[in-house]
Every structure is written in structure tokens, then in C-alpha cells.
UniProtKB/Swiss-Prot annotation:
One of its GO terms (biological process) is translation. InterPro entries: Ribosomal_bL32 (IPR002677), Ribosomal_bL32_plant/cyanobact (IPR044958), Ribosomal_zn-bd (IPR011332). Keywords: Ribonucleoprotein, Ribosomal protein. It comes from the Bacteria. This is Large ribosomal subunit protein bL32. One of its GO terms (molecular function) is structural constituent of ribosome. Gene3D superfamilies: Single helix bin. Belongs to the bacterial ribosomal protein bL32 family. One of its GO terms (cellular component) is large ribosomal subunit. The lineage of its organism: Bacteria, Bacillati, Cyanobacteriota, Cyanophyceae, Synechococcales. The keyword Lipoprotein does not apply. HAMAP family: Ribosomal_bL32 (MF_00340).
Length: 58
């Protein structure tokens, strides 16, 4: 017969939530840092397409 599992404690729940929030904050900080480097023109770790002018095609 199926028996329900024990309830997860508040401490364990809060710990998991804190880890999840910390990972999200780290990802947001990295994204902001990459965005700043792209805007300032100092980005060298990756390649992104540059806009081409239409005069070359005519």
C-alpha cells in the first residue's frame, strides 16, 4: 500500500531556495558583465555578427 513520504522541513526548503536564488543571481551578474563589455567594445571572448552596410551590395 502506498504511504506518503515525510514532509520536507522548512530549513531544507529554505536552503534549496537560497541555492536556487544564488545561482540565478550569479547568472544575472554574468549576463550584465557580458553586456557591459559588448557595449564598451572590450568583448574578446566570443564572436557576434557585425551589421553590414547596404552600399556594398549595389
Amino acid at each position: 500500500m502506498a504511504v506518503p513520504k515525510k514532509k520536507t522541513s522548512k530549513g531544507k526548503r529554505n536552503q534549496r531556495h537560497a541555492i536556487w536564488k544564488a545561482k540565478a543571481a550569479t547568472a544575472a551578474q554574468r549576463a550584465l558583465s557580458i553586456g557591459k563589455s559588448v557595449l564598451s567594445g572590450r568583448a574578446q571572448g566570443f564572436v557576434y555578427p557585425m551589421q553590414e552596410s547596404d552600399d556594398d551590395e549595389s
